[in-house]
């Protein structure tokens, strides 16, 4: 996990709690596309033969011996190489065999209910980009301020609420959590009596944050090495089941493309 969980001794931890100009992190500075991260996808798509791009379908089964993928309309596609970037726990669903099911069940992760909220006015917090809320009495653990990042004139933010991997998040749960969220934002002083919710949307991240341990990491590596022999590769933050940045994912994809092109 490298820089995401760097080694730190007690003095370093205490020092990082202070207003210290020398305190830095792996993402202290960064470059970001002017038109958003979607511009990467658009550039790649524009360079492809669009007749070979199939959208609006879902893979439901993979035959790794005969190198075929079955789609949700019953059609089958023969492949030379198969590169997966979808979450590994979902990807394992496409294979038949107890070993795939066992690995799937062993994977640990959480789900996150995300609210995107738009209000009629700014908050008193005008410089913060995100905050962690270490309070069990509050239903969310992290919030972020889109408006402060974009220098907008109305409060817009995201809220993250954690769940276990086996938890079922119903519509009723979403409504309850939205009500609690607004109450807690008010209690924390982030919104006031004059602040009104104008727009909101909901996203359920499943999985959200993967949990890495020695045993499952070993089994994942064995799966990846075995399936590489069948020309199947699984990469990306969720496909490789790891912690990484967008840059890491892009480099991994570039390295794999160069490797396969050289074969």
Locations of regions flagged by a protein language model:
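Mid-domain catalytic core of redox enzymes
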Residues: 57-175, 180-190, 217-226
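A short coil-to-beta-strand element that immediately follows conserved catalytic motifs
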Residues: 112, 192-204
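Short FAD-binding loop at a beta-strand-to-alpha-helix junction that anchors the flavin cofactor
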Residues: 158, 223-242
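A conserved FAD-binding loop/helix module that cradles the flavin
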Residues: 238-260
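Active-site/ligand-binding neighborhood in enzyme catalytic cores
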Residues: 1-67, 85
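Charged, often glycine-rich, active-site loop that binds/positions anionic groups
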Residues: 208-219
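General small-molecule cofactor/ligand-binding pocket signal
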Residues: 54-56, 198-201, 233
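Active-site-proximal substrate-binding core of FAD-dependent oxidoreductases
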Residues: 204, 261-263
């Amino acid at each position: 996990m490298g820089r995401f969980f760097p080694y730190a001794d007690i003095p370093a931890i205490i020092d990082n709690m202070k207003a210290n100009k020398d305190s830095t992190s792996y993402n202290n500075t960064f470059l970001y596309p002017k038109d958003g991260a979607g511009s990467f996808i658009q550039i790649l798509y524009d360079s492809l033969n669009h007749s070979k791009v199939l959208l609006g379908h879902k893979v439901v089964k993979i035959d790794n011996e005969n190198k075929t993928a079955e789609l949700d309309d019953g059609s089958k596609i023969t492949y030379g190489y198969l590169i997966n970037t979808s979450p590994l726990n979902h990807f394992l669903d496409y294979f038949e065999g107890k070993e795939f099911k066992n690995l799937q069940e062993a994977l640990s992760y959480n789900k996150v209910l995300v609210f995107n909220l738009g209000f009629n006015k700014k908050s008193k917090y005008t410089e913060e980009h995100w905050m962690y809320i270490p309070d069990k009495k509050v239903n969310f653990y992290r919030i972020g301020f889109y408006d402060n990042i974009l220098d907008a004139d109305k409060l817009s933010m995201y809220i993250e609420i954690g769940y276990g991997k086996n938890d079922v998040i119903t519509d009723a749960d979403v409504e309850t959590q939205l009500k609690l969220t607004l109450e807690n934002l008010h209690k924390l002083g982030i919104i006031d009596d004059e602040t009104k919710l104008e727009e909101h949307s909901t996203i359920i991240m499943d999985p959200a944050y993967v949990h890495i341990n020695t045993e499952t990491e070993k089994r994942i590596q064995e799966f990846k090495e075995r399936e590489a022999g069948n020309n199947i590769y699984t990469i990306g933050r969720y496909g490789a089941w790891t912690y990484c940045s967008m840059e890491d994912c892009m480099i991994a994809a570039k390295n794999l493309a160069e490797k396969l092109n050289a074969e």
